[in-house]
Amino acid sequence: LYDALVNESILEFANRAEHIFVGKRKGCYAYQQEQINDLIIQRAYKKGHVVRLKGGDPFVFGRGAEEMEYAAAHGLETAFVPGISSALAVPGHQNIPLTKRGSSESFWVITGTTKEHQLSNDVKLAAKSTATVVILMGMSKHLAFLNLKAKVKAR
């Protein structure tokens, strides 16, 4: 079972495996989360094991914990192999330090949009701090972020 953020060329390394796309993109879901959870259980019982392939780190807004808990509740043994989160990799690739002595003592990683499709309250808190702020899944809210930051600076 693989997500939308997985580079499909990786699937060639498992050419004998059944590949099921369960990806999600804003407003467009191949499967709802409950269906993905059920597929994990069904395929594990039917095939003896299942691989849940996700892009980045499944424990950073990736529902990895939810899926592992669901599998464990159904008696499945799980193993986790962490990926590299874009929250860390992208700033590094652009030579942007997440922390830097004298300017940023911490960093926040925040979802841009909540389950209810609202701006996260944590964004408002982060805008008031001196921390580096990384917002994931936030392109549709980028004007709201900029307006919020401008209001904070004006105070």
Question: Which functions belong to the PLM regions below?
Answer:
Residues L1-V81:
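Class I S-adenosyl-L-methionine
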